[in-house]
Amino acid sequence: MKERHVDTLIIGSGYAGVNAYYTLKGRGLIISKNKNFIFWTAKLRNIVSRNLKFAAPLPFVEERTVIDLDLQSKIIQTEQEKIYANNLIIAPGCERQNYDKVIKEAMSRSTISLGTVSHFDEYLLLQLGFYLRRLGKDVKVNTSYLSWLGSDVENQVRQLVSRAGLGYTEKPELIIDECTSVHPFTFYTPSRFLELYRNVYVAGDIIKGWPKLGELAMRTGIYVGGRILNKRMEEFKPTFIFILDGGFGEGLHIRSTKPWGGDYVSVKRSRIRPLLKRFIERYYVLRRGKMGFLINL
């Protein structure tokens, strides 16, 4: 079997992996099963905007499937070779096995009831519900109205749900599976510096116990890239940031540190938020996943 030695190896071409790569200014090898960047926010929006692009090619990614790994030694085995790294970033993401199936089934029905296995995925449930309501469907959701992000968020979400005409159900028929890791990876619990072992970093949805959220994943990728460049020595401070589009002109811009035991909560409602989301949907595909100046939003 061939062997290769690299300075920095990034596993995964999703939100976290590509932003780590961009932060390192391309000075790293990135491998993934997929050479395309998929912006899932735009893909979900595609159910109401059929011509919206949600994917972009990533020519700098080497298509590889990881079959084994020794994290402490920073050795990765693919189907073609063994790769030895000085710095290793684990960012393979996770998979919601039935997500596409739930959307397809919901699109085929006129009356829909939705739920999730994990409360952390309620933001996806609500966004899907708002878009289905926009299509004129009768939609009911099983939700806490994002109460785990703070009472201010819950109150605003309840109002948005009411205005959009979404109902509530205790017995949802279509349930979005929890995101699961893919062999040979598992969910990891890194330090507050997102380090698992010396020079082995974890980024994105593969972090155990965190919400599986694209904006958050991008920030972790930027952070670990900065750590390798010795530019970011402070600990990573996660924040849940999401724009919830109500489907009929109004939206919420949500920020909260509640999932990590913090007390910061901000929720802003306006007609500008959905327009900002439309910009973001196009920006990330055009920029091939690079967060860029949007890190300041």
Regions found by a protein language model. Give the residues of each.
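FAD-binding core/adjacent interface of flavoenzyme oxidoreductases
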Residues: 1-9, 59-119
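Beta1-alpha1 glycine-rich phosphate/pyrophosphate-binding loop at the start
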Residues: 2-60, 116-152
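Short hydrophobic core segments
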Residues: 11, 83-94, 172-181, 200
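C-terminal, flexible cofactor-proximal segment of oxidoreductases
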Residues: 16, 225-297
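Glycine-rich active-site loop/strand segments that organize a redox cofactor
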Residues: 35, 44-53, 94-106, 262-270
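A Rossmann-like FAD-binding core segment of flavoenzymes
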Residues: 61-68, 73-76, 83, 134-191
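Predominantly flavin-linked oxidoreductase catalytic cores and closely associated redox partners
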Residues: 90-91, 95-170
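FAD-site-proximal beta/loop scaffold in flavoenzymes
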Residues: 99-111, 176-222, 226
